Amino acid sequence: MSQRFDVIPLFDSYQPFYALGRGELFPGDIPAVKAFVESLEDVVSESINDYRHVKDFLWSKCRRSEATYNAFRSESERFLLWAWCVHGKSIAALKKRDIEAYIDFVVSPPKSWIGTQVCRRFTVKNGLKEPNKEWRPFVAKISKAERKESLKRASRKEVQPDTGNYALSQKSLQEVFSNLSVLYNHLVEEDYAFGNVVSAVKKASPHLIVDVSNDSVKRLSALQWEYILESTKEKADEDPVWERHLFIIASMKSLYLRVSELSFRPKWTPKMGDFYREDEDWWFTAFGKGNKKRKVSVPVDFLEYLRRYRQSRGLDGLPAVGESSPLLHPIRKHNPGLQARTIAMIAQEAFDLASDRMSKDGFRDDAKILLATSTHWLRHTGASMDVESRALKDLSADLGHGKLSTTDKEYVHADDKERAASGRTRRV
C-alpha cells in the first residue's frame, strides 16, 4: 500500500455543517472538497452519490448533539476515504469481505494515515477554507501518565507519540462497528445499500476480544479523593484563583456531573440559577446526554463549596431564583462560560497537585494513577462511594440513567466483593 497521503477531510465542524443547509451538497467556502470528490468519479463513479448520502446521514442523525456529530463524522469520513482511495469502490457496492477488509485497515492503518496530534480539518486562507495538510484520519496517542513522567526527567522534553505504536482500543473498535452499523441502516432505509452486513462481520471478527468479566468503572480510592479535595482546598485558601478548581472537582464528584454538563454549548449555558431551592432542599438542573435535562439533588455539605466559590467571585450567599451569572466564570470575557476542554485542564491541575503530594508522602503508586485520571472518574467516584448509602433508584435518577439496571451494573459489585473475599486468603 502506498505510503503517500493524498486524501483530504470531507466534512466541516458541527456549526458550519448545519449552517450550510440540507439542500446544499458542497460547502461554498471549501472548494477543495467539491474538487476532490468530483475528481474521483473516474475511479468510483458513485463518489458524489456516496458523499450525498453520507452528508444526509449526518444531517438527519446527528443534529441534536455536537458530540454525536463528531463521532459519526470521523467514522463516516475515513470510511468514505478508504472505500474510494484504498479499495476503489462505492460504499453502496461493498460486501461482507469488503467490510472485513476495512476493519483490518482500521486496526492497522498505514503510517501515512496516522497523525501524532489532533488537528483542525481546515485552515482559513484568503477568506476560504483549505484542507489542513497536518490532518490525518487516525491519531497516535500516549497516556497522560507517560507524558507527565517524561516532563519530570532531566531532559524536560515531552515524549511525543509514535505513529508506529498506533493501537486501536477494544472500546474504539466496538464504536467503529456500532457507527458503521447505524450508517448502513440509514443507507438501507434510503434504498442506497442492499443490506447491512456489519453485525455479521462483527460477530466473526478476530480483532474483537470477548470480555465476560464485570469490570468496575474507573474510580478513585477514598485516599486519592481525600488528597485531591484537601490539597485543592488548601491551595484555594492560599490563592483565590484555585476556588474555581475546587468548585469544579466538588461539583463533578458530589453531583455526579459529566464535564460537558459544566460547559457551555450551543444549546445550553450553565448558570448559577440552575441551582434552586424547594422547601428545605437544594437541586441542580443538569443538561446531559441526549439533550435531556435532569434534576440532581444537592447535598448539604456541597453548599459550603458553592458559597465559597461565589464569594471568590463577589457574589452573595447562595444563588437567587433565576440568577443569570455564569456557573463557571470564563477565562476570556467574551465567552459565556468555560468549554469542556478548559474544564478538563483545570481539573487536571488539581489532580497533578494531589499526585505530587501523594508521591512526597510515599504513596507513589496512588500518585501515578492520578496522572492518568480523567474528569469522568469524579462522577464514577461519587456514585461508587454513595451507592451503599443511597437508594439505588435515587442514585440512578441523579446520575441520569434511563434504567435502574444501568446503575446496578456499573456500581453494584456484590458478587465481586464476595469473590474477592473468598480468594483473599489463598496460599501460594
Q: Which residues are covered by each model-predicted region?
A:
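N-terminal core-binding DNA-recognition domain of tyrosine recombinases/integrases
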Residues: 53-70, 77-214, 234-235
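Basic, Lys/Arg- and aromatic-enriched nucleic-acid-binding interface segment
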Residues: 170, 226-259
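Short pre-functional
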Residues: 181-185, 243-263, 283-284, 385
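Short, polar N-cap/turn motifs at the start of nucleic acid-interacting alpha helices
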Residues: 269-275, 389-410
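Short, basic (Lys/Arg/His-rich) helix/loop patches that form interaction surfaces
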Residues: 344-397, 404
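DNA/chromatin major-groove-contacting recognition/catalytic segments
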Residues: 397, 409-428
